[in-house]
Every structure is written in structure tokens, then in C-alpha cells.
Amino acid sequence: MVQYVVEWLPRIQSISVVVEGWKQVEIKNLKDTLMSISGDEEQVEDILLPVEVEEKVDASYKFKNRGKDLEWMTKLRSKSSKIYDSSIMSLPDGRWTKEELRSDSDFSIECLNCKQKIISKDNCQVLNDMPSEFWFELMDYWHCHKPDVKEDKSSYTRFETLKPSKNEILIGSSYFQGTPATFENVATTKENDNVLCIKCSAVLGQVTAGSLYKLHKWKLQLIRSGNTYKFPPECDITISLINVVKANSCRYVLVKCKTESLLVWIFSVDIGVTLTGNKSFKRAMKLLYTNSVTTINRCLNRQVVEELDFQETSFNAFYSALQHTNALLPSSMKKIGEWTISYTSLI
């Protein structure tokens, strides 16, 4: 079986194609976003490119052997993409955003398990985004440097915690948050502060330190414009990685869950990728990852590493998705030294 990976680096308008599995590879057709290749036994494979290729070049495109058995590579020049924005802050904010929900006033959000309505126009009159990572950093700075004023402390302390009003929903990258009075179709448990669906008792989230209810998007489903949308649990971590890049440009993140840890190196951001079977990521991150304790400890000592904790469902789904994508890569593209290579979609 032939395996391949296509990487588009929009900043330099370069497309690299690596193919493995045939003794010979030739380009039969190359037009717009379609590349047709043939093998030594007249096998044909159509590969969908992430972007249109520049066909008028000085030399014709050809595959060259990489010095390894059955592995070939070519580099193409892409047409400039008018929709591409190289700014880090242009990276997507996630799914089920304020703008997306406001586009349909009749949207509803249900328990994924039993379809009980949790959020609808009946209990959602105001939608607001949660403050960005920058806000939380500012609050940390504020606590270290706030004035020593003894008289009227209320003018300062009222900004230290989030206090949404009744029927106001705060939208985070992978969760919704609101007051107990807003979420009438949920219940709580005293022993572990879980928030449960009132109908089926499925765990939807937790009670925060500020006594708000925090509901995970991946425990819910969105009904909008007659369509049903689910939130993949792995997106919880993917969006957190995007936020780390936006907030402080950190490229090393230690993803933790209980006793397990996965060190993720955010190698490339906002590139186009096509994998074996034409699995396509229009906007992707290239991630290198490892669970080697030796490598993790060495990196912690030498690099600035952001550490993030996640629930088991999100962690397992993210790790599984990385492994599944890695399995689609040609042999020499699966690892770099002690790091395993993978990709994840930004959208």
C-alpha cells in the first residue's frame, strides 16, 4: 500500500510531497489542487493538495528518490493564498463560539447522552466570551501589585472574580460557564462537586471555585439551523495548545492527566496537510510528542514548558488521534529522533 504526506508551508509558498511504497513514481497530471501519480506497475493514486499549485515554473516537477527504499519526494511551488493570514492572533478560537451561536437565535445545547436541553433561548439571554489567557495573566499580575488600600476594598475586589448574571452564558474554548440559577436542568453532587444532567445523571462538568457551573462542550451536542454538531474531546487539548501559542508563543506543552504525561512540541502552526487516503487538514499544527520520562525531564530543565492538566476523556482522545494520524505517515516521516510526529486540525 502506498503511503504519503503532503505539507504546505504557506509562508514560503512551498508544497512537499513524500510518497512511499512504489519502486518508481511519476507525475501523470498536475492541475489546481489535484496531483495524479503512477507507480512502477501502473498503479495510479490521486492526491488532493492543500492549495493550488503553481504550474508555470522554470523546470518540470519530478519525484526524486530520497536514498531509501521505495521512498520518493518532490517539492512544488504553491500559488499565493489570499485567505491566508500569517498572524498568530488569526488562529481560530475554537468551535461553538459566540459568533457561531448568535447566528441562530433558536440554537439549543443538549446533554450528549439523553438529549435533555441544557442551554436554549429559555435560559440564555446573554452570550459573552470568557476572558482570554491575557486576562488571567493580568489578574496574576494584579494580585502581586494591587494597591494596599484599607478603606473601600470593593472597588478592587469586584474585578477579581467572574460574576455572570442569571441567564448569562460565558463561552470558553471548550466549555460553558454560568450561575446555578441559569442551569436549571442540571444537578450537583456534594461529594465531588460534579454537575450532572438532571434527566440521566451523566456528568456534564464541575462546580468551579467561584461556585459557577462549568459544562464541558464534549459532554454536550449543539443543535443549530436544523443540524446536530458534536465536540470531539481531543479538541479540548488542541484549542488549549492554540491558546498557549497565542498567549505567550510557548512551543513546549506538558499535557498531563493524573499520573500520565505527554510532552508536546508545537513544531509548525497553521500549515496545510494531506495524508494517506486524502485525509486533509486545511489548517493544521505539526506536533512532535513523547512520553519518555528522560526526554521530558531534560526538556523541563532546558526549555520554557507550559504545563496543562486535562480530564482523562480528553487526554485519551487526543493521544489516540495523534497515534492514528502518525500511522498514516511514510516510515521515515513517523519520527525525528526520540520524538513521534503527528498533525492535528486547527478547525
Swiss-Prot record:
One Pfam entry name: HECT_2
GO terms classed as biological process: negative regulation of protein ubiquitination; positive regulation of mRNA 3'-end processing; proteasome-mediated ubiquitin-dependent protein catabolic process; protein autoubiquitination; protein monoubiquitination; protein polyubiquitination
Assigned GO CC terms: cytosol; nucleus; ubiquitin ligase complex
GO molecular function, one term: ubiquitin protein ligase activity
InterPro entries: UBQ-conj_enz_E2-bd_prot (IPR019193)
Signal peptide start-end: none
Protein name: Uncharacterized protein YJR141W
Taxonomic lineage from the root: Eukaryota, Fungi, Dikarya, Ascomycota, Saccharomycotina
